[in-house]
């Protein structure tokens, strides 16, 4: 459940101020996860609200082409949210500008969604911290969704995904403290736990690209103790530049008190948007398919590593491609 947006982006690493043309695609945190799961052969259903006009239909079609079930999408409202993405390179970071005010989902109400019907026969519900950031009414919708999911015995995952351009840390903390009481599997990056809950790893300097992996064991345990999570996953990005990142993750399983770190990939980035979402999609797939804690985090990180090589929000990879990389084949050699 979340907002599916139009993505407008200059071609060929151009800056906004020099671009004459923009590429038109779609994306959004939870939609990106749904596409990943559909590509892995899972039955993925996406829930949102979109206008009943041609642009709203184009957004829906962008999901249908990859096998996502769009039958639960509510039609109504006037706007599809937009985000403008300027891709960075080398020492110039990427820039994202939102134009989401008065979008259909931002102006939705709890009456728009019949969650009891939506959750019939469902195993897993996923949302991110981006969606409740759209406004108090959307926080209410997320809360109703979580309550219904719990009533139906559905597992709930949430990627904290703090976005400072959408709300303040204080607003995020209040809303996410409320919503996280329902969550079973929490996903965070190396900064989200600090930004939202004030929980941070020692001896870590994000901007210098210095990650203290061991410090994130404490972060995961504090999150689990605070909210009763069953599992906590934390992605660890070492940003050498906009073009080159180190990429790994940790998965903490509370029941076994097991902390598993993935191998680290050194990435040459084509498009990092959706990188965290592709991790989430990979993790959900792995957990639903009974993979061990170590195998689950390896699959999720490998899926995300591959996404960084793919243009657009969606992760266009197969299970076999992910498993091949997770198993150690990162050569990138041509397959004949």
Where are these regions (language model features)?
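Positively charged, low-complexity intrinsically disordered leader regions
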Residues: 1-15
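Short catalytic helix/loop segments, enriched in acidic residues and glycine
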Residues: 15-34
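Alpha-helix C-terminal capping segments
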Residues: 25, 33-44, 286-289
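Histidine-anchored nucleotide/phosphate-binding helix
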Residues: 29-39, 142-148
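Conserved N-terminal subdomain of the carbohydrate kinase-like
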Residues: 43-132, 322-336
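A short helix->loop->beta-strand "cap" motif at the edges of active sites that frequently abuts
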Residues: 148-155, 227-230
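Conserved phosphate/ATP/ADP-binding segment of small-molecule kinases
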Residues: 166-255
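Conserved post-catalytic alpha-helical subdomain immediately downstream of the catalytic base
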Residues: 260-329
């Amino acid at each position: 459940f979340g907002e599916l947006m139009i993505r407008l982006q200059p071609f060929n690493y151009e800056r906004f101020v020099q671009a004459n043309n923009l590429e038109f695609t779609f994306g959004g945190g939870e939609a990106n996860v749904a596409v990943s799961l559909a590509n892995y052969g899972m039955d993925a259903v996406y829930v949102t609200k979109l206008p009943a006009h041609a642009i709203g239909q184009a957004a829906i079609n962008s999901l249908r082409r990859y096998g996502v079930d769009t039958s639960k999408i509510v039609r109504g409202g006037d706007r599809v949210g937009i985000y403008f993405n300027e891709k960075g390179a080398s020492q110039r970071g990427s820039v994202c500008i939102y134009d989401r005010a008065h979008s259909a989902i931002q102006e939705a109400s709890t009456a728009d969604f019949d969650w009891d019907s939506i959750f019939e026969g469902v195993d897993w519900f996923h949302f991110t911290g981006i969606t409740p950031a759209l406004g108090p009414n959307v926080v209410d919708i997320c809360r109703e969704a979580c309550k219904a999911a719990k009533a139906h015995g559905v597992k709930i995952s949430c990627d904290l995904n703090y976005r400072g351009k959408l709300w303040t840390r204080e607003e995020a903390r209040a809303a996410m403290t409320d919503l996280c009481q329902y969550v079973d599997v929490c996903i965070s990056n190396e900064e989200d736990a600090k930004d939202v809950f004030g929980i941070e790893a020692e001896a870590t300097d994000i901007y210098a690209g210095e990650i203290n992996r061991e410090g994130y064991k404490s972060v995961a345990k504090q999150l689990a103790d605070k909210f009763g999570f069953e599992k906590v996953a934390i992605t660890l990005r070492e940003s050498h530049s906009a073009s080159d990142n180190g990429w790994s993750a940790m998965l903490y399983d509370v029941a076994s008190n097991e902390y598993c770190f993935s191998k680290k990939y050194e990435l040459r980035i084509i498009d990092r948007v959706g990188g965290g979402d592709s991790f989430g999609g990979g993790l959900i797939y792995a957990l639903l398919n009974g993979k061990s804690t170590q195998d689950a985090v390896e699959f999720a990180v490998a899926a995300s590593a591959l996404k960084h090589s793919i243009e657009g929000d969606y992760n266009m990879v197969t299970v076999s491609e992910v498993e091949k990389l997770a198993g150690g084949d990162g050569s990138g050699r041509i397959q004949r």
